[in-house]
């Protein structure tokens, strides 16, 4: 008997997650100077994290032999002030929002339960739901209607077996938001948990933030992250805002020390450096508009409106997305080929914001490729 006979059948069905490519990988594979590579593929903050974090991390070096606090009161207080939500309604994850997603599946899902996921969207939802035994009911962001959520495709899939519904807004990779009236209708149509993923909410209209819905409804969990505008993708800090009951259940099965000392210190400092946060947010929105307007000039591309720090682009010059992205890679440009996103045809790629210098170089290279 081989190890294959011991592995769960559901795991054998999975394909490994395809992340955005790194500068190191492209430099190694294509022989390009890493300093000349333009990385616009992973929805990161191109200005990095607060410069105050480096000094704070030095203070932690002498303590790395000690376990971190399972719950850091200072971090919880800072998140509470930032979100204007009570501490008791917040749970922090040490693998970004992915940990919160996985833990909520662990407390909700029994074999055969159902989870509704509109696609195309963030692929981790389906991976986590499936591994815990859920059956996926696919809804859709309608490609024929600028990827607006087809709300009926969600409502028609709700049954007594539905345990959770994932709503990413702004949606990854399409960049658009789901109208609040549609989310309200879904939340009030079921007692299943509705997970509102707000990973990119800072880049959206400030009036759209639905984090306080976690207090209005018992069946809402709002996901937030430090990986985007705060520039801490490498530290893996995410959190959820939800009812006290759900927080209590999640704390029973949450990994104890998943948030490292370095991660905690980084997140606290990032929240305290409000000036750097505002700079990154304002320049990020300006960068987004610069790339969007630049790409709109190319007739061979269809660029979709966005309220995130990235935008979805469709190739219309005869190439598929993988061929197009390969051409860009050879020129030192990393964008995200979206072929691996369920529900998308193989003609889409996603572009993240860059610094203004990176944007200028990127748009120049794009003009060489598409014209």
Curated annotation (Swiss-Prot):
UniProt GO BP: L-histidine biosynthetic process
Matching CDD domains: AAT_like
InterPro entries assigned: Aminotransferase_I/II_large, HisP_aminotrans, PyrdxlP-dep_Trfase, PyrdxlP-dep_Trfase_major, PyrdxlP-dep_Trfase_small
Residues where N6-(pyridoxal phosphate)lysine is found: 228
Entry keyword Transcription regulation: no
Reactions mediated catalytically: L-histidinol phosphate + 2-oxoglutarate = 3-(imidazol-4-yl)-2-oxopropyl phosphate + L-glutamate
Keyword set, alphabetical order: Amino-acid biosynthesis, Aminotransferase, Histidine biosynthesis, Pyridoxal phosphate, Transferase
Pfam families per record: Aminotran_1_2
Entry cofactors: pyridoxal 5'-phosphate
Keyword Transmembrane: no
Gene3D superfamilies the record matches: Aspartate Aminotransferase, domain 1, Type I PLP-dependent aspartate aminotransferase-like (Major domain)
Major enzyme class: transferase
Protein's recorded name: Histidinol-phosphate aminotransferase
């Amino acid at each position: 008997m081989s190890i294959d006979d011991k592995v769960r059948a559901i795991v054998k069905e999975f394909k490994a997650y395809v992340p955005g490519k790194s500068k190191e990988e492209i430099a190694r594979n294509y022989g390009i100077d890493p300093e000349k590579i333009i990385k616009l593929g992973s929805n990161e903050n191109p200005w990095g994290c607060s410069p105050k974090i480096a000094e704070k991390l030095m203070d932690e070096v002498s303590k790395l032999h000690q376990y971190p606090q399972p719950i850091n009161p200072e971090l919880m207080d800072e998140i509470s002030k930032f979100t204007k939500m009570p501490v008791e309604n917040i749970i922090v994850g040490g693998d970004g929002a992915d940990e919160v997603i996985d833990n909520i599946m662990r407390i909700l899902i029994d074999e055969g339960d159902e989870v509704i996921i509109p696609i195309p969207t963030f692929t981790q939802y389906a991976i986590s739901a499936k591994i815990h035994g859920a059956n996926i009911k696919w809804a859709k962001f309608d490609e024929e209607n600028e990827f607006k959520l087809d709300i009926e495709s969600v409502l028609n899939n709700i049954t007594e077996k539905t345990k959770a519904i994932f709503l990413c807004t702004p949606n990854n990779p399409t960049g658009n938001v789901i109208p609040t009236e549609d989310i309200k209708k879904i939340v009030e149509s079921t007692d299943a948990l509705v997970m509102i993923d707000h990973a990119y909410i800072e880049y959206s209209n400030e009036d759209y933030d639905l984090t306080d819905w976690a207090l209005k409804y018992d069946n809402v969990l709002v996901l937030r992250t430090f990986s985007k505008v705060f520039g801490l993708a490498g530290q893996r800090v995410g959190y959820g805002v939800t009812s006290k009951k759900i927080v209590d259940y999640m704390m029973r099965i949450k990994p104890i020390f998943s948030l490292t000392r370095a991660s905690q210190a980084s997140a606290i400092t990032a929240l305290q450096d409000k000036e750097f946060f505002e700079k990154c947010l304002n320049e990020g929105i300006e960068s987004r508009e610069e790339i969007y307007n630049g790409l709109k000039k190319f007739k061979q591309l269809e660029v979709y409106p966005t309220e995130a720090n990235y935008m979805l682009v469709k190739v219309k010059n005869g190439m598929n997305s993988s061929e197009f992205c390969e051409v860009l890679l050879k020129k030192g440009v990393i964008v995200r080929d979206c072929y691996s996103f369920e529900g998308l045809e193989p003609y889409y790629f996603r572009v993240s914001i860059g610094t203004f210098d990176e944007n200028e170089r990127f748009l120049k290279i794009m003009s060489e490729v598409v014209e």
